């Protein structure tokens, strides 16, 4: 695994996850341009990783294929690690993912992360259209093992895919008599004991998505550590927690932006389209008592406030979990506020300006 050092004065490494949020009044083209700018800002401010997520058929999320956005970012950045957080593997064939991330590793050697999740990243109908009847959720561990074997080109003798090779990759280099290339750094993503135990058994780094729920985080991380088996790529457990954050000089503006994200989640939970409303539209909505409870839950989950207030919460999270890395999930309708969030957190922890 690529070495990871704490960021600035923080006792953990800091990274960024972008969901390609595209709000009301915004185009996907504008979103992609702003993602490039945000990745470059994250690199300049010393963040360790910049990941993109996978979502389908959602008005508020533009990256149905994080690997395509990552391909663009390889040419727009120089040092920061780039990755998918993640590829929802049941939506894909492992060989194709191995090929695509082999290409990314070729474009940015030593900088590519491949986070693997099993959620659909969409609604049931769209998931069915993507998977065409394949019950891939039930075979996620087998899919992961198959993908890892394609990446390393190490299927055992007698395996039906022993003669199938992901290109670019180790087999191509051997055939062409050149140095063996590196492979993407594979992570297991999740928010449950299932994913934690799988990551530990495979000897892979584990990323817990706190933005989806926090009830089992300590249990999941402890299960991962207890289940961990050293592998060729990782000798000891390594953990990352992603968390939704909005920081601003004005705490009330941070809350307004967090409210738009909470409203988007409310809409999805009540079977409305996952739209990211403007702060004005979001604040003008009159929720029912039950809806207000849902909004309050997400407003607690999406950490918002001044840079110091958000950083205090991150410190408490680290103290409670002992996590090695914390990944800031960008939130809100305003890309300017998302950029300000990264600046304020970087300033608080004294991250270098590169």
Protein language model regions, located:
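N-terminal beta1-alpha1-beta2 module of alpha/beta enzyme domains
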Residues: 1-80
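An alpha-helical appendage that flanks or caps ligand/catalytic pockets
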Residues: 2-8, 134-175, 216-322, 353-354
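Flexible, glycine-rich active-site loops centered on histidine and acidic residues
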Residues: 9-28, 91-156, 206
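Conserved, mostly hydrophobic/aromatic
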Residues: 14, 42, 46, 54, ...
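Hydrophobic faces of well-ordered beta-strands that scaffold small-molecule active sites
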Residues: 14-18, 50-52, 82-84, 112-116, ...
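Active-site mouth loops of central-metabolism enzymes
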Residues: 18-33, 87-95, 180-190, 248, ...
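Short, acidic/polar
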Residues: 29-41, 191-197, 309-316
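A conserved active-site cap/scaffold subdomain adjacent to cofactor or substrate pockets
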Residues: 191-212, 220-221
